[in-house]
Curated annotation (Swiss-Prot):
This is Large ribosomal subunit protein bL31B. One of its GO terms (molecular function) is structural constituent of ribosome. Belongs to the bacterial ribosomal protein bL31 family. Type B subfamily. HAMAP family: Ribosomal_bL31_2. Keywords: Ribonucleoprotein, Ribosomal protein. GO terms for biological process: translation. The lineage of its organism: Bacteria, Pseudomonadati, Pseudomonadota, Gammaproteobacteria, Enterobacterales. NCBIfam families: L31, PRK01678.1. It comes from Proteus mirabilis (strain HI4320).
Length: 82
């Protein structure tokens, strides 16, 4: 079996900058940045979106109503359909 072919698995701090949330997770991601968190130094990765900020997970997603489009279509073209 080959030696030293697996990536290093370590604890990493992920920072969701949009909501200022920090996550301490095991990962193999490579980064040169570090941060002090809870009194220890960890590798640091910034995120734009995570489960703390994504609309699907926060319940703030917008659903588009098709009722207005259908009503507008029927108003314009309903007289032609019979």
């Amino acid at each position: 079996m080959k030696e030293n072919i697996h990536p290093q698995y370590r604890t990493v701090i992920f920072h969701d900058t949009s909501v200022d949330a920090y996550f301490k997770v095991g990962s193999t991601i490579q980064t040169d940045k570090t941060i002090e968190y809870e009194g220890q130094r960890y590798p640091y990765v910034t995120l734009d979106v995570s489960s703390q900020s994504h609309p699907f997970y926060t319940g703030k997603q917008k659903t588009h109503s098709q009722e207005g489009n259908v009503a507008r279509f029927n108003k314009r073209f309903g007289r032609f359909v019979n």
